[in-house]
Every structure is written in structure tokens, then in C-alpha cells.
UniProtKB/Swiss-Prot annotation:
Compartment(s): Cytoplasm
Listed name of the protein: tRNA-cytidine(32) 2-sulfurtransferase
Catalytic activity reported: cytidine(32) in tRNA + S-sulfanyl-L-cysteinyl-[cysteine desulfurase] + AH2 + ATP = 2-thiocytidine(32) in tRNA + L-cysteinyl-[cysteine desulfurase] + A + AMP + diphosphate + H(+)
GO terms under biological process: tRNA thio-modification
Database matches in CDD domains: TtcA-like
Lineage: superkingdom: Bacteria
Keyword Transport recorded: no
GO MF assignments: 4 iron, 4 sulfur cluster binding; ATP binding; magnesium ion binding; sulfurtransferase activity; tRNA binding
InterPro entries tied to this protein: Rossmann-like_a/b/a_fold, TilS/TtcA_N, tRNA_Cyd_32_2_STrfase, tRNA_thiolation_TtcA_Ctu1
Pathway assigned to this chain's UniProt record: tRNA modification
Note from the entry: The thiolation reaction likely consists of two steps: a first activation step by ATP to form an adenylated intermediate of the target base of tRNA, and a second nucleophilic substitution step of the sulfur (S) atom supplied by the hydrosulfide attached to the Fe-S cluster.
The protein's Enzyme Commission number: 2.8.1.-
Major subcellular site: cytoplasm
Organism of provenance: Pasteurella multocida (strain Pm70)
Gene: ttcA
Amino acid sequence: MTMTDTTQQDKKHTYNFNKLQKRLRRNVGNAIADFNMIEEGDKVMVCLSGGKDSYTLLDILLNLRLNAPIHFEIVAVNLDQKQPGFPEHILPEYLQSIGVDYKIVEENTYGIVKEKIPEGKTTCSLCSRLRRGILYRTATELGATKIALGHHRDDMLETLFLNMFYGGKLKSMPPKLISDDGKQIVIRPLAYCKEKDIEKYAQAKHFPIIPCNLCGSQPNLQRQVVKEMLQKWDRQYPGRIETMFSAIQNIVPSHLCDTHLFNFKDLQRGQILENIEGDIAFDKPEFIATSPIDDDDEQQDFHQVELINVKEIH
């Protein structure tokens, strides 16, 4: 390969990376606007696990803050769960290198989970509850007004199917929620972002990823089964994931079976109901989004290239 070829290839990689970054910025910005996730004067506590999703969340929020029409603070928080072999130095070194306020919370949730959960059983449920309580407490201590989590579009769809298959509910992850005691607001700014985009972005940025030895590496999890099912659908039927996500944004209560959402009992002959679709059970295919948008860089490799960011953060 000649020097000219190398230069052209580098330019192409850089162009595609910048395009990927802009798409993530746009998706996060749209989610923030659609659900009023961040407001003037907010102090946003970004929960940083050391995985690709939370790194990307922090990076994009820092980028967006530079040109945001409102002022808000960001503080990164990591929960050190005292897992054996956990590289405690990685996150502090990274956060110091980019100049972000941060707090490392040390709690031996690993020991609690191992004590309470029999060997071979899934630890996710207990681990999640313990983490949630600690993060809520930490947000109060820091004076944070919003807690930002790194769940993305694929996580939301996986949760939808998990609840349908195993819980008997049509329920997903909300992009924004209020805690049971009403004291905390949790936001998911990556709600519109695809996991494939996040993975490519994290690889391109060379984030120092820390694997989870509690839950992420456990085999045969129900979530992993659902994830593989969705990935297979995505390969076989391009656009299906986009259509499914569109579906949870377009709910028609009159065409489901939940009597709490729609008053079926009082329907009478001759009634004319506004904004009710009547006997139309299946929308015409041409009205359903069937293909992803702006994905012509889908197969690009951004690993070994000098990057030019839209906004470089130091």
C-alpha cells in the first residue's frame, strides 16, 4: 500500500468516525429534548461502570455541554464493588486525564451478592438493587438533580421482550423515571442510540474498558438469549429493530387488552370516538419504518486511525 493509499484510507476512517460521533450526538440530543432530561442548572451524576456504554454516555454529554443552550454540571460516579482483581486505578486515571469531577464509592456489594446468592445462580437482580440504593444515596450526598445511566435502545428492546416472555407485561425501560420515594430522577440519554454505534465509538476512542465479573460474564442469562435473538433478527431482517423501537413509541391502547388503559366496557354501538382507529388491526406496511437511516458506514473499522473529533475534550 502506497503512502497516498494510506492517507486516503485514513481520511475515510476519520470522516466515518466523525459521522458516527455526530449521529450519537444527535441521538442523545434528541432524547434529551424529547423527554426534557436535562434542564438549566442541573447537576447530572453520570454512573460510570467502566463499560463501553457509560464511557460513551459521559463522552457525548461532555461534548454536548460545550455547545448546550443551558448550563449544567457533570460529575462521574463509579461504584467500586470490591470484586477480586478489579483494577481500581483505571477509572480515576482516565477521569483525571479528561478533567472531570468524579467520586469513587467503595461498597462491598460483591461480598454481599456472593454470600446471599447460591453458586451458579444469576446475581443480576440483587446486584442491581444494591447498586441502585447506593447510587440514590450518593446522588443525594452530591446534590445531583439527575442520575444518568448508560442504557441504550437495544437494552430497552431486550427488556421489553424479557418482560413479555418471562413477566407477562408489556413493559420496557423508560427513558426517564422518578424513584419510588420521589426524590431522584433517572435519565437514559442513550435511549435512541444503537449498541452497534456505541461499540464502534468505544473502540475508536480506545476507552479503558473494565469487564464485569459479577453479571456480564455469567453464561445462559435470559437477557443474553433475548439479545442473541434480536441480533439474529437484525441480520436476517434489516430494519426490524428500528420498527420495533418505533412500536414502543406509538402505543394504541384501544387495540390492546388492558382495561386500565382503555374503557372497553362502556363502548356502545353508534359511538364516534376521536383518535381511535376502530377496526384497523394492522397498519399498511408502507407506513412502517423498515430500514435504518444514515448507516452507510456500518462496516467501517475505526480502530487504527488518528481521529479528529467534532469537539476534542481535554
